[in-house]
Amino acid sequence: MALLQIAEPGQSAAPHEHKLAIGIDLGTTNSLVATVQSGEARTLTDDLGEAMLPSVVRYQAGGITVGSEAVKSATQDPVNTLISVKRFLGKTQAEIEQSYGQLPYQFCQHDGALAIETAAGKISPVKASSHILAALKARAEQSFGNQEILGAVITVPAYFDDAQRQSTKDAAELAGINVLRLLNEPTAAAVAYGLDSGQEGIIAVYDLGGGTFDISILRLHQGVFEVLATGGDSSLGGDDFDSLIVDYLKQQTGVTTLSPAVLRLFINKAKACKEALSQYSTVNVGLEFDDEKHMVEVTREKLDELAIPLVKKTLRSCRRAVKDAGIENEEVLQVIMVGGSTRMPLVRSQVSEFFNKEALTSIDPDRVVALGAALQADVLIGNKPDSDMLLLDVLPLSLGLETMGGLVEKIIPRNTTIPVARAQEFTTFKDGQTAMSLHVLQGERELVDDCRSLAKFSLKGIPPMTAGAAHIRVTFKVDADGLLSVSAMEKSTGVQADIQVKPSFGLSDDQVSNMLKESMSNAKGDMQARMLKEQQVEALRVIEALEASLASDSGLLDEAQLAYLRAEIAELVKVRENAQQPNEIKTAIEKMDNASSDFAARRMDASIKKVLTGQSVDNI
């Protein structure tokens, strides 16, 4: 909810002055900044009238260049010209090399994080991103006569993980930008179409940008934007189509190894070729390097042949998202196309064929995300009642906690709308337990070994009590940016521990898909394994409780009775270790309960007798 400052008349020169907030599309290839004026969202341009700022930064000993000027130096100075750094956010060097292959950069470590060696020193992807954001902020300030920018909504791919989202926030902080919210790019597109076109119903947002792909299925109704399901791949985008063309050009020219400068030349030519083939059926690509000249003809048919596997990969994500949303293709009213890569005729035709309807492109696919971000920023800064629009994103995978026996207790199920907070109480397993280890997990399976570990932390200072007496309240909170924090508190003392989850390794769409498929194909076996584990845990509890009782009160039994109970314990231990079915252990536990019932009664009688000894009837 936006807060209004109340002042006496005369104290505020313009009590109803429009507050300036901006929406930023921090893209892999290009970035944009937009704002809302007179109720209309519009992108802001530079001195040359260009709205798109190339997401390129060149570092020299004497200074930094951002945007089009930096692009001009990419071929001559590829090592110091950083392109598509968004793809590196929250990634390790090994992940980058595995995903993107040969790159003209020299990676290194700086302050424990990934960086790139440049003439201006070691530059992290976060720092490079901050320079792009700072340039966009400066453009906005210049457009409004240096009026103060009060806040910004910055868009991110829906499948950015916590580390990538936090890196984006860090970059904004370095750029001096107050982040009102991180907004998923497909959701931003829906904001733009929902407000501008008054759409209602189920809409698919197909977002294929320079470096990432997202598919979101949304329900739009009376200003409410609810994401029913999401999918995507944080390592699939227009750059990958460029790489396919680069490989084809290398094949046609007979080149196997490229220097950084020549590689950048090939990439630039490939990108231009791809864009030209959106309008023409044939393009001749001229390549001049190493004192040689080459001319390679590339047809749209050849590009389609190269690109179809990647396009089909995006459609597999679409198919799963539709299934996750619990709908049929026919229920999708509109398909919104977002991102420059959706200009490819192959992409448009394949997506239209998949959803059996013409894709919607009435808003420039390059600008729609920035426009939606600007509209949301206008709401959050207080220029509109926040009841005008509500955004509900969802979790792609369930979040839970490890419990005894290696089981997973799901705290927040997948596809829950965020922001969200859920709490659950747990207790100790052993007498005198003073600490508890908490293991946070992500996934749909029943056992810890089959889920993804996110973080571990400990709660210490639990007062010594009998097993099951302590009450530990564990709270999971996922904020509007998809960042998870987990806290644990022992209720009697208030002792607390917490952690913010920032996993270093992201999940690709394939990994998410595999996790979901495995959970479905193994559902029956997983539940059987869970039931077996639960009975094993219960058997262990019974065994340890009885052994503790015998250690303190064995004097209540004669030798034969004691030997009988120890034999029953040994039998339960054996069944617990060897049983394949939960009912086998359950039957053994019931047998153990019956065998020890007389001993339990004797202990109860002894305890009552001890309490009553020396007491008068009046005292009782």
Curated annotation (Swiss-Prot):
GO terms for molecular function: ATP binding; ATP hydrolysis activity; ATP-dependent protein folding chaperone; unfolded protein binding. One of its GO terms (biological process) is iron-sulfur cluster assembly. Chaperone involved in the maturation of iron-sulfur cluster-containing proteins. Has a low intrinsic ATPase activity which is markedly stimulated by HscB. It comes from Pseudoalteromonas translucida (strain TAC 125). It comes from the Bacteria. InterPro entries: ATPase_NBD (IPR043129), Heat_shock_70_CS (IPR018181), HSP70_C_sf (IPR029048), HSP70_peptide-bd_sf (IPR029047), Hsp_70_fam (IPR013126), ISC_FeS_clus_asmbl_HscA (IPR010236). HAMAP family: HscA. Belongs to the heat shock protein 70 family. This is Chaperone protein HscA homolog. Keywords: ATP-binding, Chaperone, Nucleotide-binding. PANTHER family: HEAT SHOCK PROTEIN 70KDA.
